[in-house]
Amino acid sequence: MIKRALISVSDKTGIVEMARELQSMGVDIISTGGTAKTLSDAGIKVINISDVTGFPECLDGRVKTLHPKVHAGILAIRSNEEHMRQLKELNIETIDMVIINLYPFKQTILKENVDLSEAIENIDIGGPTMIRAAAKNYQDVVVIVDPSDYAAVLEELKTTKDVSLKTKFKLAYKVFEHTSHYDTLIAKYLREQIGEDEFPQTLSLTFEKVQDMRYGENPHQKAVFYKEVGANVGCITAAKQLHGKELSYNNINDANGAIEIIKEFDEPTVVAVKHANPCGVASASNIYDAYIKAYEADPVSIFGGIIAANREIDEKTAEEINKIFVEIVIAPSFTEGALKILTQKKNIRLLQLEDISAKIPKGTYDMKKVPGGLLVQNYNSELLNMDDLKVVTEKKPTQEELEDLIFAMKVVKHTKSNGIALAKGKQTIGVGPGQTNRVTACKIAIEYGGERTKGAVLASDAFFPFADCVEAAAAAGITAIIQPGGSIRDQESIDACNKYGIAMVFTGMRHFKH
């Protein structure tokens, strides 16, 4: 039976109603600071924490509840005769319910221009200590950290005069989930202040649920989408859905791929993605022309794909997009007329991501879960260093070819390995993704390009192990190649390029993607 409840909350949602209901059941309310004032102002009788401890709050409120009369009252096992004897001897009363949520550390660090001292002041000490104590003694103490649990607990109390052990256990689990999340945010924030690139000895990650999904990558797989706290700049988690059905697992994965590619480009660009691989990418002087070129790059694969643009979608562009079926259109904004046109199709998802071109922050991790472990690396934010570009052939690329080579490298960087991208006039004309050997990827890209490969350039995400890709490129009329270099047979590829009059540039930077 609950006789005394300790309440101290930062999020005061529903707390007055909760306390009033508890008091109507004969429960004494103990409280601290601002919570005590809120409850008192609402006409609820409150016992101040200092009246329980016999010790005043001090150090600007830093020390309020860190006292044996609080923690012994929470931690005492009621069925343990020795525990109860000691409480009586020390004149300590039990505390049967603890309702606490912690200082708003997350909200503080997400504010603009927050400084370290303000963040530090919002690290809760007493709160985590009390809720962990209550959760440890869950068989005797009800602990609530989430206002959404108030109603269910009250319903049980009204119905049975008590709270079931099953409910207490569930609430205790939520405490450790809550404190783990809280401490991980603190550790992450402090690590970011140090600014070191070294990987920590232990890696704690915390994410918040965004939505349950109908299914995962396939219908027989369950799935949920979580977001990383504070990492929403230019990310899919920050996108605002303006129209259409709920995003699926595959939608989010593909949309993320499109966003990552579009970040590589400064001039008006449109990216079309299918199964996380680019199928059409083009840059132009305006977004309409960029879309037309991206569509014409591969009008078959774009069907049912994802489109991302780095400029506002206008009516003219929307009219063209509406001629085919696409799953998603992502852009920094849409004109009112464009929205009117695109929303004629009820199933198309329209996502607004205002800062779509924002670069991924330095220090961002790229992670891949494997059974029993986690692979972690720095995010691949680099493309190439212009100072490291090395022309290795007799023929040098023209300025136009060089611009197309860099364009193609931006695309192939985001193509599953082994990957090849062909481009001409800042438009992909063929992409060969995800092959187990490079020459097959090359042949696929050339097949997509058809007659357009004449005068095009080729980008490879890794070095050529043999000269066979150069042979295939020469036969297709390709005039320039960009690749990392680094093969023990580089000279064979260089000799082949010289034989066919192809310019070749080494970047010294590989871009595998798995």
From Swiss-Prot:
HAMAP family: PurH. GO terms for molecular function: IMP cyclohydrolase activity; phosphoribosylaminoimidazolecarboxamide formyltransferase activity. Pfam families: AICARFT_IMPCHas, MGS. Its EC number is 2.1.2.3, 3.5.4.10. PANTHER family: BIFUNCTIONAL PURINE BIOSYNTHESIS PROTEIN ATIC, BIFUNCTIONAL PURINE BIOSYNTHESIS PROTEIN PURH. It comes from Acetivibrio thermocellus (strain ATCC 27405 / DSM 1237 / JCM 9322 / NBRC 103400 / NCIMB 10682 / NRRL B-4536 / VPI 7372). Residues 1-145 form the MGS-like domain. SMART domains: AICARFT_IMPCHas, MGS. Disulfide bonds: none annotated. Gene3D superfamilies: 3.40.140.20, Methylglyoxal synthase-like domain. This is Bifunctional purine biosynthesis protein PurH. The lineage of its organism: Bacteria, Bacillati, Bacillota, Clostridia, Eubacteriales. It comes from the Bacteria. One of its GO terms (cellular component) is cytosol. The keyword Transferase applies. CDD domains: IMPCH (cd01421). InterPro entries: AICAR_Tfase_dup_dom_sf, Cytidine_deaminase-like, MGS-like_dom, MGS-like_dom_sf, PurH-like. It catalyses: (6R)-10-formyltetrahydrofolate + 5-amino-1-(5-phospho-beta-D-ribosyl)imidazole-4-carboxamide = 5-formamido-1-(5-phospho-D-ribosyl)imidazole-4-carboxamide + (6S)-5,6,7,8-tetrahydrofolate; IMP + H2O = 5-formamido-1-(5-phospho-D-ribosyl)imidazole-4-carboxamide. The keyword Transferase applies. Belongs to the PurH family.
